[in-house]
Amino acid sequence: MDEKRVLVFGTFDGLHPGHHFFLRSAKTNGTHLSVSVARDAHVRELKDKVSVDREQERLRRVSDLSFVDEAFLSDEELGTFSVLENARPDLIILGHDQEALEASLRLWMESRELYIPIKRLPKIAR
């Protein structure tokens, strides 16, 4: 089977079963799961709060998951996505609440004449 690379983005603060479900669901769309973990500065700017766990701890916890093939910190500059060039995804999976990220990704890709399909996962009922 050919490798299909999937990329997701997130903060993953206080890694919990909902994060596990999202990541496992994303992995079912491909054979290789890459995870871009948000930097502390981005969490402060976008969510107007300080994350419980620092970026290196969040990165370590995500990296330790058996179904995650690689994890790395997001670009230092908000709104840039050089991680796409490094991860080389065939598909980007976003959560139900990542509308702003989707818009930013589409603008960035359009400016570079790059097209990577984006799929949104639905909100899960609790």
Please annotate each region the language model reported:
Residues M1-R126:
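Nucleotidyltransferase catalytic core that binds NTPs
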